[in-house]
Amino acid sequence: MSNNNFKQEDLELLRKIGKKAEASQRDLANDLNLSLGKLNYCMKSLMRKGFVKINRLKENPSKIKYILTQEGIALRTKLTIDFMKKKMAEYDELKRELETKENK
């Protein structure tokens, strides 16, 4: 599973779905500061790739619940780990730069 095609907004969307499965696309778009059109595009892509599925709520069939599939959970985990590794590498680089400047 290559994550070269995934962006930070995909990780944020996967995390939000994991926390707020019953949120509407409008709620998710507002939470992530994305346009509704962009959120819809990202959501369709994640569903097409099998990372997210939808279920209609029994008590209100017009409402949708977004669910992470096992693949979606695995992707969220991998993207989170990759994000943390990137941030730790950035931190280490900044720390080296500061130490170099202090030693001059």
Where are these regions (language model features)?
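Short, cationic-aromatic polyanion-contact patches
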Residues: 3-10, 24, 55-78
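Residues within the helices of the helix-turn-helix
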Residues: 15, 26, 44
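Key DNA-contact positions within bacterial/archaeal DNA-binding proteins
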Residues: 26, 36-37
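Alpha-helical residues within the helix-turn-helix
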Residues: 30, 47-48
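Amphipathic alpha-helical dimerization/coiled-coil segments
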Residues: 75-104
